[in-house]
């Protein structure tokens, strides 16, 4: 309950995005934008032409979505969600 790791994991979906890109255009512009903004790549979905990223602290997720949607080749930007099974 007071576990720092648990607290960190429960808050993480609020600062993670899944970004899909057009495979024919590639992901170079997206990768440069991710690096420029100080984001962390959590997973690279090669079969789906997408990446899961963690935003740096202090960057509003809605502003990040708008930013990444403008990057050349990006097709979709979604908030990452975690669901608990009951």
Q: Where do the PLM segments sit?
A:
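Bacterial Sec-dependent signal peptides at the C-terminal "C-region" and cleavage site
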Residues: 1-9
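Short, low-complexity disordered segments enriched in Ser/Pro/Gly and basic
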Residues: 9-15, 46-48
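Hydrophobic beta-strand residues in large extracellular and virion-surface proteins
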Residues: 17-19, 34, 39-41, 53
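Short, surface-exposed ligand-recognition loops at beta-strand->loop->(often short) alpha-helix junctions
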Residues: 17-28, 57
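Extracytoplasmic/secreted envelope proteins and their assembly/folding machinery
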Residues: 27, 31-34, 62-65
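Autoinhibitory propeptides
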Residues: 40-86
């Amino acid at each position: 309950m007071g576990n720092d790791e648990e607290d960190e994991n429960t808050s993480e979906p609020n600062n993670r995005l899944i970004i899909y890109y057009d495979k024919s255009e590639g992901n170079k512009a997206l990768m440069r934008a991710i690096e420029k903004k100080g984001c962390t790549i959590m997973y690279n979905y090669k079969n789906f032409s997408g990446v899961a990223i963690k935003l740096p602290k202090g960057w509003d997720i809605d502003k990040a979505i708008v930013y990444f949607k403008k990057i050349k080749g990006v097709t979709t930007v979604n908030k990452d969600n975690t669901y608990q099974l009951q």
